[in-house]
Amino acid sequence: MITIDKILEILKNDHNFREILFHEHYYYNWTQNVTFNALSYDSRQISSDTLFFAKGATFKKEYLDSAITAGLSFYVSETDYGADIPVILVNDIKKAMSLISMSFYNNPQNKLKLLAFTGTKGKTTAAYFAYHMLKVNHRPAMLSTMNTTLDGKSFFKSHLTTPESLDLFRMMATAVENQMTHLIMEVSSQAYLTKRVYGLTFDVGVFLNISPDHIGPIEHPTFEDYFFHKRLLMENSNAVVVNSQMDHFNIVKEQVEYIPHDFYGDYSENVITESKAFSFHVKGKLENTYDIKLIGKFNQENAIAAGLACLRLGVSIEDIKNGIAQTTVPGRMEVLTQTNGAKIFVDYAHNGDSLKKLLAVVEEHQKGDIILVLGAPGNKGQSRRKDFGDVINQHPNLQVILTADDPNFEDPLVISQEIASHINRPVTIIIDREEAIANASTLTNCKLDAIIIAGKGADAYQIIKGNRDNYSGDLEVAKKYLKR
C-alpha cells in the first residue's frame, strides 16, 4: 500500500510533480487521507483503491472513462483529461511509475543482489550462465527474454526483455517473498529509453557487446541513441564487467574508469587461451579449464562475462565452473541429427552480428552443404533486413530459404522480399515457416551437411497482427522431419 502523502513526497523529491488538478482547482498538497492498495496501467484492472497511470502515446480518454466506471478515484498523468476525479500531473509518467512502484512494493531491490546484462546479443545466454553459477549455493531469481523464474522452480515466458516498472517491482517483491537472494536481469536499451528501470542501481552491470540493432521509427532513431541508452547501465551499477573486444570499447573504458570494473577478451587480463568445441581455458581472475555444453567461442566469452560478474558477487571459482558445465539455453545452439547424419541447428540468432557468428560456428564443424532458414520480424528492427543480406553475401555457398518470423502487422512476403533485395543471388521464399523447414530437410545428403533454423529459437508462437498465434516451435517442427 501507499498513501497520497508518500506519493507526493516521492514526486516532489524527484522534481517530477506539477500539481493535483480537480474540477479546475489546483492543489500542491492533498488534505484528505487517501491510501492505494493497487497500482495499474491497464484500465481493465481497476478497483476503487487503485492508483492508475494513464501512459503511452496511444492512450485514449475512453480508457480512463472505463476505469472510472469500474471505481477509479485517482490517476497519474502528464495530461489532464478533464475527468470527474483528481489527477496527479507529472512531467514524466515513466519516472513516476518506477519510483512509486518501488516504494509501493517496499523497495524489494534493496533485499536482493542485482545482476544485469546488456548488449546487442548474448544477454539471455549470459543470464543463464549466471543463473546456474549462482544456484549452486544461492537462490537466484531470473528475468530473461527466454524464461522468467521468481522461485527457482516454475518458469514462464516474458513479454518484454525488461518488464514495465510496475511489473518489475511486483516481480522483485514476489522473489523476496520466495526468499530468493539474487536477481539476474536482462536490461534492454528500451528499458532505459522508456525509464522502466529508472532509479534502480545494480550491484553488477555487464556490457557484452554492441552492434546496430533496434533502430527504427518506434525504437531508437539512430545507432548513437541506441548505444547511449545501452551505456546507461554502466552509470547505474556499483561494479561493471565489459567486453574489451566490443566496438567502441574506448568510450566505455573511459566511462567506467572510476567504477570498480573487470574487462575480458583480447588485450585484457581475462582472456581465453585455448578454445575447443566443449571446453576452454581462461587466464586471469577466472584461471581454470572449463567444460561447456554450448559450442562457439562467443558462448565461452558469455560464460566468462557471467563468471566475472558472479565472482564480484562472492561466488567461488568452483561454483562458476560447475555452473558453466551445467548450462543449456532453450533455443540456443540446440542440435538435432537427421537419419542421414546431417545436423540441424536451432538458434535464436536474430540480427546480423549473431547470424554471422552462428554461421562461423556451424561452418567450422560442418563442411558440406549448409541450408539457412531465416526471416525477420515486422514492425521492429528494420535495419536487420539489410544486415541479414550483407551477412549472407559473405557466404556464397549458403542455400537460403526466407520465411515468416513474427511478421506482426507487416506482410511477411514483403519482409522476405526486402531481405532478398539485399542478397546478391537468387533465394527461395516459403512464407509458411513449417513448410520452409520441411523443404530444407529434403536438401541434405550426408553427415557433412547442415540446416540452420535461425531467429525464433524456442519461441512457440508467431506474432501476427498483434497476437501470439500458435506455432509448434522450430525445434519441435524440425523433429518431425529428421528422417532423411
From Swiss-Prot:
Keywords: ATP-binding, Cell cycle, Cell division, Cell shape, Cell wall biogenesis/degradation, Cytoplasm, Ligase, Nucleotide-binding, Peptidoglycan synthesis. InterPro entries: Mur-like_cat_sf, Mur_ligase_C, Mur_ligase_C_dom_sf, Mur_ligase_cen, MurE/MurF_N, UDP-N-AcMur-Glu-dNH2Pim_ligase. Pfam families: Mur_ligase_C (PF02875), Mur_ligase_M (PF08245). HAMAP family: MurE. NCBIfam families: murE, PRK14022.1. ATP binds at residues 119-125. The keyword Cytoplasm applies. Pathway: Cell wall biogenesis; peptidoglycan biosynthesis. This is UDP-N-acetylmuramoyl-L-alanyl-D-glutamate--L-lysine ligase. Coiled coil: none annotated. It is an enzyme of class 6 (ligase). GO terms for cellular component: cytoplasm. Carboxylation is probably crucial for Mg(2+) binding and, consequently, for the gamma-phosphate positioning of ATP. Belongs to the MurCDEF family. MurE subfamily.
